């Protein structure tokens, strides 16, 4: 593709000068032939002018073919480059820690990178080839004009410089405006999402939020449009005023060439050629400077992409795939964690030990740090201090893939993929994503098999409303799908359940956990739940308050201690009396 583009650019760059020169030969040939005509004869030898006409027609056809070829190549390159750059962005996103996605400045970088990613690389490539084409054309024009006078070339260059300087200045200003308003742009996109997504539609209609959100959308748009309008008007006004300089230079040169023709210094064909070359040269030089200014502007915007792709990635992962003491289970040793940008620790000095086969329930009010602890265990975060060990080895030293293959997890805000039922379960083990026999085993363990069999196409039923024929599930059914997803990892010996049954009634939850306990006798389980009927079934219970572990023991021991756990338990029990 690059070689073809280079060849077509070479042809398109050289032919305009050649066409202008052939035009001169045509005019001079016509004049010469008419002067040779005898007064008493009607015959005129027109073979030479007609030959030049044919030659020019061939050159024009080749120029048109090369220009059309450039358009075709650029269209194909646009698709390939956009795909490649988007893949680069997505591949980079996969390497980043979760903390990046919880940082608003990172989202500004991501928004700026993605917004221009599909057009700027192609624009830079096109302008680079365009600059090469214009440079070749200018060389041929310069060779022709220098025969007239070196000053013609100087005037051609100087006339285009003011507009180039102004355009470059405005390009820098446009980029600064673009960069500064990334938060407002994200805000606008967020409101678009709210108004266009089915998962938000119900609440927006019931709370009658539509007009309010549209008002905010218009407000943000008005602000952004105002900035764009002012810049565009100033850019256009200065562009017009400075283009008058180029126009004046052309007509001065025009007058000069006419005078030179009248006094006999140049032929009529020379005049035709110089006028054509000067006008086209003026346009070509302006285009070349525009390409340079555009390349400068493209590089400014691409700096956002470069910044994103160069975002530092923590690589704390080791290469250990097996622990030194498989019977030791999991240990937290004085683990603390503070979110980036926060001065208040989310967890402080957490220490616990869970042996193989033991079940630990984590209890605490919302915001106490329960889910943060789970994210540290699953290596979505790295402890600020302290360490977590699995089978006697620090999690930092484990190979990430080997570690995560050992963990089956359901978060409270699990993803409801707009895939088939089977794929929604299969994502729990991407290596067996299409294994239908594994789907069925996992669905049985997650107690989802019964309702799946009632769906129109069983495991092949499309879920969600985004695609044709999609079926929506109840909250409880989705949670059973999520449970089945966790059981896809048959080799996992650590199960993490963060409010896994919050959308299921108490009776169904009790049945699920009795079933679940029987299936996980040899697995370590971390359970977060606000339902004490479930929590009391754990071997150990840990109570977290403001990021600190304040109590630990069995259900009976904690009730006897009459502390926070007992208070929360009796508060919930009173609600059932």
Where in this protein do the model-derived segments appear?
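Juxtamembrane helix-loop junctions of ABC transporter transmembrane domains
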Residues: 19-23, 27, 59-102, 106, ...
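Juxtamembrane loop-to-helix connectors within ABC transporter transmembrane domains
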Residues: 70, 74-78, 91-141, 196-208
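Conserved catalytic Walker-motif region of ABC-type ATPase nucleotide-binding domains
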Residues: 93, 217, 332-334
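ABC-type nucleotide-binding domain
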Residues: 318, 323-577
């Amino acid at each position: 593709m690059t070689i073809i583009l280079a060849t077509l650019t070479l042809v398109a760059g050289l032919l305009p000068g050649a066409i202008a020169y052939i035009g001169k030969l045509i005019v001079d040939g016509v004049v010469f032939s008419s002067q040779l005509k005898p007064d008493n004869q009607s015959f005129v030898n027109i073979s030479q002018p007609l030959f030049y006409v044919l030659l020019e027609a061939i050159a024009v056809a080749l120029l048109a073919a090369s220009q059309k070829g450039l358009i075709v190549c650029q269209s194909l390159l646009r698709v390939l480059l956009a795909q490649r750059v988007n893949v680069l962005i997505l591949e980079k996103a996969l390497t980043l820690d979760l903390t990046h996605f919880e940082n608003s400045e990172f989202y500004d970088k991501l928004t700026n990178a993605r917004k221009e990613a599909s057009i700027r690389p192609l624009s830079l490539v096109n302008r680079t080839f365009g600059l090469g084409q214009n440079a070749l054309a200018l060389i041929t024009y310069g060779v022709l004009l220098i025969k007239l006078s070196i000053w013609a070339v100087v005037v051609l260059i100087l006339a285009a410089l003011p507009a180039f300087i102004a355009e470059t200045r405005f390009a820098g200003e446009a980029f600064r405006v673009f960069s500064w308003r990334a938060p407002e742009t994200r805000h606008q996109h967020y409101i678009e999402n709210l108004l266009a997504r089915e998962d938000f539609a119900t609440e927006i209609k019931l709370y009658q939020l539509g007009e309010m959100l549209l008002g905010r959308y218009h407000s943000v748009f008005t602000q952004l449009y105002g900035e764009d309008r002012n810049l565009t008007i100033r850019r256009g006004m200065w562009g017009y005023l400075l283009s008058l300089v180029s126009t004046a230079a052309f007509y001065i040169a025009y007058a000069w060439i006419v005078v030179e023709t009248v006094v006999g210094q140049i032929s009529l064909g020379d005049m035709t050629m110089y006028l054509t070359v000067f006008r086209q040269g003026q346009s070509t030089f302006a285009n070349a400077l525009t390409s340079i200014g555009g390349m400068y502007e493209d590089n400014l915007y691409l700096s956002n992409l470069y910044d994103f792709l160069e975002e530092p990635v923590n690589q704390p992962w080791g290469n250990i795939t097996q622990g030194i003491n498989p019977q030791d289970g999991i240990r937290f040793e004085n683990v603390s964690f503070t979110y980036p940008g926060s001065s208040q620790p989310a967890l402080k000095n957490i220490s616990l030990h869970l042996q193989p086969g033991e079940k630990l329930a984590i209890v605490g009010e919302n915001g106490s740090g329960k889910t943060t602890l789970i994210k540290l265990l699953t290596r979505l975060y790295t402890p600020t201090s302290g360490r977590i060990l699995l089978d006697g080895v620090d999690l930092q030293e484990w190979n990430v893939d080997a570690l995560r293959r050992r963990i089956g997890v359901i978060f409270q805000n699990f993803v409801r993929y707009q895939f088939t039922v089977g794929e929604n379960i299969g994502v729990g083990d991407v290596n067996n994503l299409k294994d239908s026999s594994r789907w069925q085993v996992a669905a049985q363990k997650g107690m989802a098999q019964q309702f799946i069999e009632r769906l129109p196409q069983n495991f092949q039923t499309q879920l969600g409303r985004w695609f044709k024929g999609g079926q929506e599930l109840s909250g409880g059914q989705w949670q059973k799908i999520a449970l089945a997803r966790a059981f896809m990892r048959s080799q996992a010996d650590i199960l993490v359940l963060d409010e896994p049954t919050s959308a299921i009634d108490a009776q169904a939850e009790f049945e699920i956990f009795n079933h679940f306990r029987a299936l996980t006798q040899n697995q370590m389980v971390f359970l977060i739940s606000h339902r004490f009927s479930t929590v009391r079934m754990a071997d150990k219970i840990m109570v977290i308050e403001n990021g600190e572990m304040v109590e630990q023991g069995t259900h009976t021991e904690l009730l006897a201690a009459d502390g926070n756990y007992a208070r929360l338990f009796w508060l919930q029990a009173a609600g059932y009396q």
